[in-house]
Amino acid sequence: MSKGTLFDKVWDLHTVGTLPSGLTQLFIGLHLVHEVTSPQAFAMLRERGLKVLFPERTVATVDHIVPTENQARPFVDRLAEEMIQALEQNCQENNITFYNIGSGNQGIVHVIAPELGLTQPGMTIACGDSHTSSHGAFGAIAFGIGTSQVRDVLASQTLSLSKLKVRKIEVNGALNPGVYAKDVILHIIRTLGVKGGVGYAYEYAGTTFEQMNMEERMTVCNMAIEGGARCGYVNPDQVTYDYLQGRDFAPQGADWEKAVTWWESIKSDADAEYDDVIVFNAADIPPTVTWGITPGQGIGVNQLIPQPEELLEEDRFVAEEAYRYMDLYPGQPIKGTKIDVCFIGSCTNGRLTDLQEAAKIAKGRRVAAGVKAFVVPGSERVKKAAEAEGLDKIFEAAGFEWREPGCSMCLAMNPDKLEGRQISASSSNRNFKGRQGSASGRTLLMSPAMVATAAIQGEVADVRELL
């Protein structure tokens, strides 16, 4: 059993009690809401005559279904328009803060909460979205939940949960040029498997994470769920505090000093006990690309697609399925795979530093003929900041489309979709069958800089050759 970890401390501080089932009733400090998983939850509250218990701890935005080109209302997609109208109504009726399109603060929920300073160390955070683990980058314990649990949090501000074990994942050393936070998490998932973290919270530690900025840490924590972990986190430090200070909802003045003192106290103790510890060397991590239909099917850009006998027996069936679906074969280089669509964005990699790294590759170059490439900022604030630096002009000059904020091609809930057997280079987080809108479309996950490289070369290529 873990002891003295940040997870233990935050869990214990937010425990309301133990239910007859043995589950812990956990208080949720911040509930983030969007248009897809909330309508049914609000409807269930209405049926029971209930109101949102703590509207001041609830914040909403619209992200999944919003078009990234024509955002004029009403939306062309009738269902999307109905969903945003429902969220507008539900927030108004329950006095919930709602950041709508054009507010200056709209964007992907896991991008706007940190940039507003809503996400803070030591919090418990829930959202009806798988990638809520992103907020763990701040030393928060953040869970993705389903619609019925969204209802529970709206009504009671609590969740019924089993306490997780804690695995410490240590990565030490400096990353090589051309290797980014996305490569780190893809490498971890590749090594431990998509089910390796089931029953665990992941604590990311080591000198590599200490050297990362907050947006890089968010990328890693975002994909903890893809490795099976319910949540992932990094202990807060000066990097965290420098990011938060002065943001809209961050403590101010004397309250700031008190907050930092408390945040320091909830960090994992030096002698904390973990259920498991796994250590990686940053120098061993290459620019990584997924070749299959799970985020765990990744290889270095210069490596070959694995032979079945190289895999664990339990992974071979999915590998055989992936070979067929992706139309790739064992022993084939992933480098040189032709690309049709390049997507830079998502809650994994749609922040300012992600766009900056991709722009370094795009600057002075051109998107290859026949490739559709587009960049979708993660929020209105990210878009404004990027345009202030001229990143939009760099991308457009290179032949990329510059879009409005939203989840975009990460998932098939808006107009940005693959067609037929198209294959994409994507900075998003999931490469499941049909994930990007076509039942036969294919997705290769990689860092934003690697996506930009693929766009320029028209195929999977090594970003280090363009640095």
Curated annotation (Swiss-Prot):
Binds 1 [4Fe-4S] cluster per subunit. Pathway: Amino-acid biosynthesis; L-leucine biosynthesis; L-leucine from 3-methyl-2-oxobutanoate: step 2/4. CDD domains: IPMI (cd01583). Keywords: 4Fe-4S, Amino-acid biosynthesis, Branched-chain amino acid biosynthesis, Iron, Iron-sulfur, Leucine biosynthesis, Lyase, Metal-binding. The keyword 4Fe-4S applies. One of its GO terms (biological process) is L-leucine biosynthetic process. Its EC number is 4.2.1.33. GO terms for molecular function: 3-isopropylmalate dehydratase activity; 4 iron, 4 sulfur cluster binding; metal ion binding. Coiled coil: none annotated. It catalyses: (2R,3S)-3-isopropylmalate = (2S)-2-isopropylmalate. It comes from the Bacteria. Its cofactor is [4Fe-4S] cluster. [4Fe-4S] cluster binds at residues 347, 407, 410. PROSITE patterns: ACONITASE_1 (PS00450), ACONITASE_2 (PS01244). HAMAP family: LeuC_type1. Belongs to the aconitase/IPM isomerase family. LeuC type 1 subfamily. Heterodimer of LeuC and LeuD. Catalyzes the isomerization between 2-isopropylmalate and 3-isopropylmalate, via the formation of 2-isopropylmaleate. This is 3-isopropylmalate dehydratase large subunit.
